[in-house]
Amino acid sequence: MAKKITGYIKLQIPAGKANPSPPIGPALGQHGVNIMEFCKAFNAKTQGDEGTITPVVITVYADRSFSFITKVPPMSVLIKKAVGIESGSSVPNKNKVGTLTAEQVKEIAVKKMPDMNAASLEAAMRTVEGTARSMGVEIV
């Protein structure tokens, strides 16, 4: 028989830097999960991408065990990494902070596709372009 699920926890944690302090500790603690066990498993799984914010969905079972799935980093993080900027523009329509090529847009769309609900690569690329525009990044 399958384990009974008691809850899901969604967090965004920097890869390789999970520790028991807030927000991770309290979120897992209220579900009775072994916090250190999760931190060690998460840090081991995300070892290669140090510092990149990684969304994770933790499934908590009735016997207080857990499993987790790491997802692709948020689109804004991927765009900032591709352009090489620290943050987006505060006034995206007036101040442009960088440029993205069509090839970079396609690369980000392909990487993000598993977590998106876009039907095609073209639709995913349009989503990436829209996010980039709202951050003040120009598409070339």
Swiss-Prot record:
Transport recorded as keyword: no
The keyword Cell inner membrane is annotated on this UniProt entry: no
One of the GO biological process terms: translation
CDD domains: Ribosomal_L11
GO molecular function, one term: structural constituent of ribosome
Keyword terms, alphabetized: Methylation, Ribonucleoprotein, Ribosomal protein, RNA-binding, rRNA-binding
Mod. after translation: One or more lysine residues are methylated.
InterPro entries tied to this protein: Ribosomal_uL11, Ribosomal_uL11_bac-typ, Ribosomal_uL11_C, Ribosomal_uL11_C_sf, Ribosomal_uL11_N, Ribosomal_uL11_N_sf
Gene Ontology, cellular component aspect: cytosolic large ribosomal subunit
Function recorded in the entry: Forms part of the ribosomal stalk which helps the ribosome interact with GTP-bound translation factors.
Quaternary structure and partners: Part of the ribosomal stalk of the 50S ribosomal subunit. Interacts with L10 and the large rRNA to form the base of the stalk. L10 forms an elongated spine to which L12 dimers bind in a sequential fashion forming a multimeric L10(L12)X complex.
Family of this protein: Belongs to the universal ribosomal protein uL11 family.
Protein name: Large ribosomal subunit protein uL11
